[in-house]
């Protein structure tokens, strides 16, 4: 069996007047993430990791922020399409390990919900999706609550 590893990263600025979506679920928060799509940094990092593992470039290549059809798109659609893209190359998702870096809102209570959504979209077991949350202890742009970042590592396998 052939396996490959990918790494992804994304960051978006926090602004007023936008909804906050993380891991495919909506959070009630006074700020949301600015972006061409719904700006779900966790899903974007996972997409980049999957595409990188399959040597298929990155999310901006497949879903450019200059394309009108992706304006305000639900990132869950992007993840489902990314899984289809790697499947067309003969790969399936093995597992995901991801971290969201944000001071607020506190994410711990909703991590299981994110795991369920992500597992469903990637057609894998929920036990194969790890989502963690951390802060930067008030340091940097994340600590000043100017933005949220996410990191993801994935393993993909040649489909049999």
From Swiss-Prot:
Alphabetical UniProt keywords:
Isoprene biosynthesis, Lyase, Metal-binding
Q: Which GO terms are recorded in the biological process aspect for this UniProt protein?
A: isopentenyl diphosphate biosynthetic process, methylerythritol 4-phosphate pathway; terpenoid biosynthetic process
What Pfam families does the entry give?
YgbB
What cofactor requirement does the entry state?
a divalent metal cation
Check the record and name the InterPro entries matching this protein: MECDP_synthase (IPR003526), MECDP_synthase_CS (IPR020555), MECDP_synthase_sf (IPR036571)
Q: Does the keyword S-adenosyl-L-methionine apply?
A: no
So where does 4-CDP-2-C-methyl-D-erythritol 2-phosphate get bound? Answer: 10-12, 36-37, 58-60, 134-137, 141, 144
- Superkingdom of origin organism: Bacteria
Q: In which pathway does it act?
A: Isoprenoid biosynthesis; isopentenyl diphosphate biosynthesis via DXP pathway; isopentenyl diphosphate from 1-deoxy-D-xylulose 5-phosphate: step 4/6
Q: Kindly indicate whether the keyword Lyase belongs to this entry.
A: yes
Give the note describing cofactor binding and stoichiometry: Binds 1 divalent metal cation per subunit.
Quick one: which residues bind a divalent metal cation?
10, 12, 44
Q: Which reaction does it catalyse?
A: 4-CDP-2-C-methyl-D-erythritol 2-phosphate = 2-C-methyl-D-erythritol 2,4-cyclic diphosphate + CMP
Which GO terms of the molecular function aspect are on file? Answer: 2-C-methyl-D-erythritol 2,4-cyclodiphosphate synthase activity; metal ion binding
Q: Which residue positions hold the site described Transition state stabilizer?
A: 36, 135
Q: Which EC class heads this enzyme's classification?
A: lyase
The UniProt entry, under PANTHER family, shows: 2-C-METHYL-D-ERYTHRITOL 2,4-CYCLODIPHOSPHATE SYNTHASE, CHLOROPLASTIC
Q: What quaternary structure, including any partners, is listed in this protein's UniProt entry?
A: Homotrimer.
* Chain's role: Involved in the biosynthesis of isopentenyl diphosphate (IPP) and dimethylallyl diphosphate (DMAPP), two major building blocks of isoprenoid compounds. Catalyzes the conversion of 4-diphosphocytidyl-2-C-methyl-D-erythritol 2-phosphate (CDP-ME2P) to 2-C-methyl-D-erythritol 2,4-cyclodiphosphate (ME-CPP) with a corresponding release of cytidine 5-monophosphate (CMP).
Q: What is this protein called?
A: 2-C-methyl-D-erythritol 2,4-cyclodiphosphate synthase
Q: What is the source species?
A: Phocaeicola vulgatus (strain ATCC 8482 / DSM 1447 / JCM 5826 / CCUG 4940 / NBRC 14291 / NCTC 11154) (Bacteroides vulgatus)
């Amino acid at each position: 069996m052939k396996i490959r590893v990918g790494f992804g990263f994304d960051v978006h600025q926090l602004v007023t007047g936008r909804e906050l979506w993380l891991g495919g679920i909506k959070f009630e928060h006074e700020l949301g993430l600015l972006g061409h799509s719904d700006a779900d940094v966790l899903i974007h990092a996972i997409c980049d990791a999957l595409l990188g593992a399959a040597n298929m470039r990155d999310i901006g290549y497949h879903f450019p922020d200059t394309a009108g059809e992706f304006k305000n798109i639900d990132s869950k659609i992007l993840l489902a399409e990314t899984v289809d893209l790697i499947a067309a190359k003969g790969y399936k998702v093995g597992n995901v390990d991801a971290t969201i870096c944000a001071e607020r809102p506190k994410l711990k209570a909703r991590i299981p919900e994110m795991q369920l959504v992500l597992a469903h979209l990637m057609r894998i077991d929920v036990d194969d999706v790890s989502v963690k949350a951390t802060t930067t202890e008030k340091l940097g742009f994340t600590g000043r609550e100017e933005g949220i970042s996410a990191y993801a590592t994935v393993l993909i396998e040649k489909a049999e």
